[in-house]
Amino acid sequence: MTPQIKTHLLPKQEPSSSENHGSSTSGIVFNVSTSIIGAGIMSMPAAFKVLGIVPAFLIITIIAWLSTISVGFLMKSTLAGESTTYAGVMKESFGKTGSIAVQIATMVATFGCMIIFSIIIGDVLSGNENGGPEHIGVLQEWFGSYWWNTRIFALLFVYGFVLLPLVLRRRVERLAISSAVSFLLAVLFVVISSVLAISALVNGQTKNPRLFPELSNGGSFWQLFTASPVIVTAFTFHFNVHPIGFELKDPLQVIPATKISVILCAAIYFATGLFGYLLFGDATMSDILVNFDQSSGSSIGSLLNDIVRLSYVLHLMLVFPLLNFSLRANLDELLYPKKPSLEKDTKRFIGLTLALLICCFLSAIAVPDIWYFFQFMGSTITVSIAFIFPAAIVLRNIHGVSTSREKIVAAIMLVLAVATSIIAISTNLYSLAAN
């Protein structure tokens, strides 16, 4: 039974409204796929380097499968109650504390990803001056170094003329076209990477990849757990399931669309990780774009490297508004729980949108590095959103709809998520202390 929509985050829907129910299956798949593929694709080759090809494939498959299960858990519990948001489902199961927990987790995750996106965009366009391998931006390569193509001005232009018009869209379904373009850009990124890898393979220039990790000492074994949070983060899209699903006439449509999206994205992740690892081997960086920035020795190779970097940056620009939509909705629900619909209050809508953009822009300028933050976020915030919270909802079973099989799966999911997170956090803390 479809629940009555009472939350202020969504407009009242009429069955005859083609605008509200016009989202096609392909549009849903593109929106979900776009919200899945983000900064995570950048770190897949590094995850393959740490894990080896076979374990990486198995972990991607397992996490993708668990992601579809947890989405099913969420939607089943949602439709059994009266809520239409992730936070609302948690409130029904765990009270106000649960609602606030998922709102804060979602806001931290989405804001963190938006900052990471902005940092990567700045790195590609204007270079990275934080040490390590020299990384010159595309704008400097093409035009030389000037004040107008420095990091701050490049990001300012992107925010003002690309991101701002997109985040001012008030409904997720209106981002379907940009989502489709974004997804195709991600596919282009994979295709070009594949072409470069196959070309290198034919010419005998590929590295010798490891099928399994090297476990030469105990530290190497524990280091394997630091790659899992990166893959978990890559499949964390659960905060967008409710906004996308409840713009449909039948919210359950989002479940089969999610399965299609997860399969597509898992294939893209595996291809990116495999071909990136084949190209660069043990020299693979945590940011694969740094490797593509290296000289290829030919004009065609340099052109392909630029296309790889720019297609990826354009993809991130088009994913950005989907994350902003979720962040803005959760922040509004937390700050103004009794206010009318956000999309009907222009002053509040624009105020929140501009405030979030400004904070994200300043953070992207100030934050020097993303890697450790990326790992810690994957082992704490995103694993909670993707697995711990949905599993807890099933085990709580406030509406009495969870089956015994679902409870067993939820319990296993919860134990695996918590155990892996504890090991990953401990290993990261040990590595930081050792360094």
Curated annotation (Swiss-Prot):
Domain of life from the UniProt record: Eukaryota
Alphabetized UniProt keyword annotations: Amino-acid transport, Membrane, Transmembrane, Transmembrane helix, Transport
Subcellular location: Membrane
A cellular-component GO term for this protein: organelle membrane
Segments crossing the lipid bilayer: 28-48, 53-73, 100-120, 148-168, 181-201, 219-239, 260-280, 307-327, 354-374, 375-395, 408-428
InterPro entries found in the cross-reference section: AA_transpt_TM
Protein name (record): Amino acid transporter AVT6C
Ranges for region Disordered: 1-24
GO biological process: amino acid transport
